[in-house]
Amino acid sequence: LRPLPGAQSVETVCTGLDGLVERAADYYAQGARFAKWRAVLQITADGCPSDLAIRENAWGLARYARSVQESGLVPIIEPEILMDGDHSIEVTSAVQEQILKEVYFACQLNGVLLEGTLLKPSMTIQGADCAQKSDPQIVAEMTVRTLERCVPASVPGIVFLSGGLSEEAASVYLNNMNTILRKAQWNLGFSYGRALQHSCLKAWAGKDKEAGQAALLARAKANSEASQGRYVPGSQPSSDEQLFVAGYTY
């Protein structure tokens, strides 16, 4: 991620398109079948994300997707909205709709085969500092509504990022989404980092391999059940610790 010239100071764009077709072909030859490209956008009181940032990041995601498809890879398209801020869930939804519509417009212009892609979005949730916290069912309903308004039915799967949610919240939100009757039949799954690994890393602590494996298995099972709408909250060991870190970058 690099600063985006002409945009606000917190706005970035992902670089690396030059030579991507050739690199992707090399990765395919080595056995890779999927690729991921992450665009990061942030909601602020002074107007972020700007139209420039949305368009540039959407275009980059579309160019990446077309490039890796040329080499046989399945592109995972990741337009992440950071949890930083005090905005409401309604604001998140409106911004996310704008971003997703721009992403799929750019994909259309670039001839991306949508049936051969996956979307990795943030869940539709309020900013971390928002005083009004939405309950899990509202988060699930707002997320599904946002996706239904913007994501083509031809996209086969949506795998959510956890973005600083606690392990338990990430599982519960996903589970609730999979209990909602949807207009489109995408598969709703997970592609979590911190919300899958946090308890595992704490239990392992560089020493206890068996404890780490047990913790990882518990979270994997919980999220597998959530992907089918069968997770019972609290039925698997998890951490309710909020994993959000303000200004987190990687």
Predicted regions and their residues:
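Active-site capping/gating regions of soluble enzymes
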Residues: H87-Y250
